[in-house]
């Protein structure tokens, strides 16, 4: 006779939502009046990963999640944590979710991924082929990094003609990316948005470099635990997506964590799959955060989980032809009072010194007067943070008319 399974705890979707928001740093507290490097570091340690993306329609994506939670913080604090030398260096770049910034403490947990990459696993097929066939080029590029220190691909580019594939990358650029994936080099800093590569031992703390090597199963299990803590609650797919882990090791790792008592299985009302959370979790009575969210924010980057939690279908339409877009080019969800209440198409028009609001779409049942005032305040604060004196409401929808009224009643100017 099979052993009787323990009864799984059940929570409502509202409780799951509050648990997720709280775990992700939306706990309803007012942001600190003065944000310090400690606030930035603590938040990133809590999230575990910031996704990097090259789109700069508003601001580079890795800056936005901190703004959504901390408010008007100096972007240089993240730059220092990510790319400074010495004690201020708290982060490293690697393939976490996608291209990501991660706390340096997670570096040992990524070595298995680096080892796989060096064997051509878990990387693009063309890069794996390059790694097999171009070891002479790779060795030459690695030697140049050893001798010259932090350098970019342009420094090594010997190509005379356009190469064609790989986004028109030179052989040296592909070699650097292969070395980066394999952990042979890391990102020492950036020149604009260009990566500057150096040897890990010249960039990262010695305690991290000399950390005893972990078994892959142990490292993967630790990443899963970090993901559960960061998400608050999630299905197996939600959790393994956080650090882009494969299904089989994720299932095994979660089962081991349950057996160890590090996490527990629960049921969320309306979810078809079982969920996981920490054993001693506390659901907030309410969450009062209001925030504009990056499309690459870890709260919403797993779109099916976003639909289950918030009943909110969201797709980024940057690569959708203009005439086929439903909501706009660069649309930020607006989180207000535990729900995603609106979508705002925004652009930083830096030459004109203004934040342009190109579309305002309310989600059912819409924003009440207080919610619309909160949106106006968020937009004004965002413009201030970006150093843009003006806000242009360039939309003829009824929601935009309500937003104009909210701006005027709050004493904010707009165009």
Segments from the language model and where they lie:
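Long, charged, low-complexity, helical-prone intrinsically disordered regions
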Residues: 1-415
């Amino acid at each position: 006779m099979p052993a009787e399974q323990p009864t799984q705890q059940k929570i409502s979707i509202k409780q799951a939502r509050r648990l997720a928001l709280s775990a992700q740093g939306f706990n309803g507290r007012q942001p600190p009046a003065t944000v310090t490097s400690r606030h930035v570091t603590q938040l990133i340690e809590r999230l575990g990963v910031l996704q990097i993306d090259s789109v700069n329609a508003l601001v580079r994506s890795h800056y936005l999640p901190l703004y959504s939670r901390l408010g008007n913080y100096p972007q240089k604090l993240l730059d220092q944590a990510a790319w400074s030398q010495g004690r201020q260096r708290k982060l490293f770049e690697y393939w976490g979710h996608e291209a990501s910034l991660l706390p340096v403490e997670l570096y040992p947990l990524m070595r298995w991924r680096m080892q796989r990459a060096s064997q051509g696993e878990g990387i693009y097929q063309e890069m794996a082929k390059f790694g097999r066939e171009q070891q002479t080029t790779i060795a030459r590029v690695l030697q140049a990094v050893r001798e010259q220190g932090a350098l970019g691909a342009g420094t090594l580019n010997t190509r005379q003609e356009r190469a064609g594939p790989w986004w028109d990358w030179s052989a040296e650029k592909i070699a650097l990316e292969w070395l980066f994936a394999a952990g042979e080099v890391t990102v020492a800093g950036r020149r604009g948005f260009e990566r500057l590569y150096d040897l890990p031992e010249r960039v990262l703390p010695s305690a991290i470099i000399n950390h005893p090597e972990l078994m892959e199963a142990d490292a993967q299990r630790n990443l899963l635990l970090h993901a559960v803590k960061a998400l608050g609650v999630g299905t197996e797919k939600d959790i393994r997506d956080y650090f882009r882990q494969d299904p089989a090791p994720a299932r095994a790792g979660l089962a081991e964590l349950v057996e160890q008592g590090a996490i527990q299985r629960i049921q969320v009302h309306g979810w078809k799959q079982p969920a996981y959370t920490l054993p001693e979790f506390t659901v907030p009575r309410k969450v009062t955060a209001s925030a504009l969210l990056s499309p690459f924010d870890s709260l919403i980057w797993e779109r099916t989980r976003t639909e289950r939690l918030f009943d909110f279908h969201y797709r980024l339409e940057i690569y959708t032809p203009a005439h086929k877009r439903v909501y706009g080019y660069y649309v930020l969800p607006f989180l207000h009072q535990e729900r995603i209440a609106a979508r705002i198409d925004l652009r930083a028009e830096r030459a004109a010194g203004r934040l342009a609001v190109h579309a305002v779409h309310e989600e059912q049942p819409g924003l009440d007067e207080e919610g619309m005032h909160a949106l106006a305040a968020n937009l004004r604060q965002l413009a201030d943070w970006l150093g843009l004196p003006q806000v242009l409401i360039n939309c003829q929808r009824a929601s935009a008319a309500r937003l104009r009224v909210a701006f005027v009643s709050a004493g904010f100017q707009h165009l």
